[in-house]
């Protein structure tokens, strides 16, 4: 994951008097996911925790990466990973995905059955782009968010 991109977003946000959410540690992640018994929990603990230990979700210029709601005061709103996956999973065909985030036109997901990271067109759920890893997906997501902010 590109820490440089997160640092650039942090500089942009600070220019508006905003801050990025504080990171959360692995123990807190496990504590917050203890009541979940599904692929979303496994994905968070095995993959997405690396991002959450840098920043607990992101809401930047219409681009959102889901985080975990904590009892702590966050500097910005956190779009809860479990809440949003529960919402998207109300549609049966969406249950094959773990939803990582979204922007105005796309969802960013992990396809459980194919072990793929994807950008999906929001209205149609057609594949826009495939990524080799979560890090590649996050780098593309963050780069695009910065580009749209310019």
Regions found by a protein language model. Name each.
Residues 126-148:
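Compact, glycine/acidic-enriched structural inserts
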């Amino acid at each position: 994951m590109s820490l440089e991109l997160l640092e650039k977003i942090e500089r942009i946000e600070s220019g508006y008097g905003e801050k990025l959410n504080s990171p959360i540690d692995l123990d807190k992640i496990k504590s917050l996911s203890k009541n979940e018994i599904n692929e979303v929990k496994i994905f968070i603990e095995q993959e997405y925790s690396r991002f959450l230990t840098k920043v607990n979700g992101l809401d930047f210029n219409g681009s959102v990466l889901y985080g975990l709601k904590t009892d702590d005061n966050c500097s910005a709103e956190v779009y809860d990973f479990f809440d949003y996956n529960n919402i998207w999973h109300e549609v049966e065909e969406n249950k094959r995905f773990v939803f990582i985030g979204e922007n105005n036109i796309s969802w960013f997901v992990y396809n459980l059955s194919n072990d793929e990271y994807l950008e999906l067109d929001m209205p149609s759920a057609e594949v826009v782009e495939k990524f080799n890893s979560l890090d590649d997906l996050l780098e593309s997501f963050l780069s695009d968010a910065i580009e749209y902010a310019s």
